[in-house]
Amino acid sequence: MNSHLEDLTTEKVNDDTVNIDVMNTEDMLKAINNEDIKVAYAVQKEIHNIVKAVDIVSEKLKNNGRLFYIGAGTSGRLGVLDASECPPTYGTNPELVQGIIAGGNEAILKAVEGAEDDEDMGRSIIKERNMTSKDVVIGITASGRTPFVIGAMKEARKNEIIAIGISNNKNSLINKNVDIKITPIVGPEVIMGSTRMKAGTAQKLVLNMITTAVMIKLGKVYGNLMIDLSLSNKKLIDRAVRIIEHATKVEKEKAMEYLKRANLKPKVAIVMIKTNTKSYEAERLLNMADGFVTKAIKLGSK
């Protein structure tokens, strides 16, 4: 599996940074920044494929499915990070979006030797998490050939589970084992083979796009405001108050009052204010509107 690494774009030498070891600090940072600029353009070229991923993921989640990120090393950590941000940002159940990293939680903080090379372990993850055709899996691997990820993708498709691949090399093995391919080609890294850099940045941008767009399509956003956030600390309560203020144009004190009356649910508070209803009626309108605030307000204004 590790043969012909030199054929991978991410493993090639970057001609623009061959002298980075003798550059002064400013030139060194400019060289890194010049490479980073290329990342967003590489992701932009893949938007048509990201659209496919967003549409299928949102459809699965609307129908009680789950989203799983599967990766190793940096790619695995990025999946875990993105998944862990969904509950506080969008008020989702931690089971809805899950990140799985080769080697388990221990690998989040330090490398677990050999974990990424175990294809059978990747296969077993599908059964361990009780994945079904209602779910969707996204495999993340810069090289496009990480055995742990490939094993998971193969097993997913074997069980009629939609598999999506995010990689940074053309014609890679993962692209032969997924239903949707997302392949931002970022070119050779600043430091040869250090895919935590441009490849990792590209992966993070793609994950940001997928979960953000999916949550919008699930009614977790009103305008560009996060209105389903979980209020687990003072900072988030303050943010929720500001969100209600902005969405309804009420004063801070009134926003806080309605937030309390809505049992600390910002979207309920917004609908209460916009439709001049009590919390139970706002909840009913939101249920009728499948959780979409704009639709709930229209229903309550009839």
Swiss-Prot record:
Active site positions, chain numbering: E85, E116
GO MF annotation, one: ether hydrolase activity
Pathway this chain belongs to: Amino-sugar metabolism; N-acetylmuramate degradation
Assigned keywords, A-Z: Carbohydrate metabolism, Lyase
Signal peptide positions (record): none
Enzyme Commission code: 4.2.1.126
Pfam families for the chain: GKRP-like_C, GKRP_SIS_N
Leading EC class: lyase
GO biological process, one term: amino sugar catabolic process
Domain SIS: 57-220
Residue ranges that the Swiss-Prot or TrEMBL entry lists as coiled coil: none
Catalytic activity: N-acetyl-D-muramate 6-phosphate + H2O = N-acetyl-D-glucosamine 6-phosphate + (R)-lactate
Stated family: Belongs to the GCKR-like family. MurNAc-6-P etherase subfamily.
Miscellaneous field: A lyase-type mechanism (elimination/hydration) is suggested for the cleavage of the lactyl ether bond of MurNAc 6-phosphate, with the formation of an alpha,beta-unsaturated aldehyde intermediate with (E)-stereochemistry, followed by the syn addition of water to give product.
Subunit field text: Homodimer.
Described function: Specifically catalyzes the cleavage of the D-lactyl ether substituent of MurNAc 6-phosphate, producing GlcNAc 6-phosphate and D-lactate.
Name of protein: N-acetylmuramic acid 6-phosphate etherase
Organism: Clostridium acetobutylicum (strain ATCC 824 / DSM 792 / JCM 1419 / IAM 19013 / LMG 5710 / NBRC 13948 / NRRL B-527 / VKM B-1787 / 2291 / W)
Gene responsible for this protein: murQ
